[in-house]
Amino acid sequence: MQPTVLLILMTSCLTYQVIADKPKGNHLHSRPERSPIVLFSDAPHAAASPADENDNFPVLKTANQYEDNNSATFSHLEEKHDFAEKQSTGDDEESVILNRVTGEVLSDTVDGSQGHLEPKRFNEFVGKRNTLPEEAGSFDADSQPGSLDTVRILAGLSNFGQPQIIDQGNMKNHRTLKNMIHNLYNTMNEDEASKRQYEFVGKRSYDFVGKRTYDFLGKRSPYYFLGKRYDFIGKRSPYDFIGKKNYDFVGKRSPYDFVGKRNQGVFTVSPSSTKISFDDNYLPYLSSVDAGDLSDVNKRYAEFLGKRKRTAEQDETSQRSNERLVALLQNTGFRKRLSRMLQNQRLVEHYPEFIGK
């Protein structure tokens, strides 16, 4: 039991000694105060003002702020800049943006770099309309601030003079060069006089903004007139007239010679010569032909549509023709040919565009 008691006493003594060495106060919520980092920004719009007694930053006094910025002395600024670098002790410290001339606070506390102070440059082109020549204003160098710098920049566009001639005080050459550059500048519109000239501005300019039909439609050759019927329909040869009912070429077979002509269904029957003997001048439903009626012999039976009064001779002739028809119908091949011809004739009457095999 004695070693255990000694171990407990030694542990308690060490604990009290550690607590006594710690500083008093709430050490969990206390944080050492850090001095802010002082940054300076170039603000061209800031004007110089007299320094106050409590101001820790000196005021820069320049003779002409817009013409010569190099005349100011920044030796005391470098000392303050070194002092500000010594105050920075980490990455998460707060920084205050002050004006380099007046020492005024320009913005709230920022973390990190001062990259947001630089003006943002839009690399992507946002479309604008083309300015007309009469809308573009004239340029006058005497009324513009920094006209001498403009002349120096534009002097490189011509070979009439050099910037050194202007700096030497030769006002005659200076005025001649400036007039030439101004005449060139006034002839250009706003887009041509800008730093960047874009070939593609906004949407494509049409020849006539109000026209509804464009020159090219789709991926194939353009149509000449959208209102008219198309010249080519489908994959086959085009039709001459869209409105006509009967086409010259229908289907895959040969076309009709005359679309309006209908087949009259005149068929020649060739009966067997063994049963019936033919007469050269035989015409059914007609009497014997006289010598004066030779013109009627060559007349086709299909063209005769009238009816005549029958006589006894015609009745005998009709009976003989009926006997001959009965004899023909006994032939199987003739019946097949006759049925095929009758079917084709019926189709031609009901469907004029049908072509039989």
From Swiss-Prot:
User: Where does the record place the modification D-asparagine?
Assistant: N123
Ordered alphabetically, the record's keywords are:
Amidation, Cleavage on pair of basic residues, D-amino acid, Hormone, Signal
Question: What function does the entry list?
Answer: Potentiates tetanic contraction of the penis retractor muscle at very low concentrations, and also shows modulatory actions on the activity of the buccal and ventricular muscles and the central ganglionic neurons.
Q: What is this protein called?
A: Fulicin peptides
- The propeptide segment or segments lie at 18-119, 130-194, 263-298, 311-357
- Which tissues and organs express this gene's product? Found in central ganglia and the ventricles and atria of the heart.
Q: Which organism is it from?
A: Lissachatina fulica
Q: Does the keyword Ubl conjugation apply?
A: no
GO terms assigned for molecular function? hormone activity
PTM Isoleucine amide: list the residues: I233, I242
Q: Which residues form a coiled coil?
A: none
Q: Which residues carry this modification: Leucine amide?
A: L217, L226, L305
The answer to whether keyword Signal applies is: yes
Residues modified as Valine amide are V126, V201, V209, V250, V259
Signal sequence, start to end: 1-17
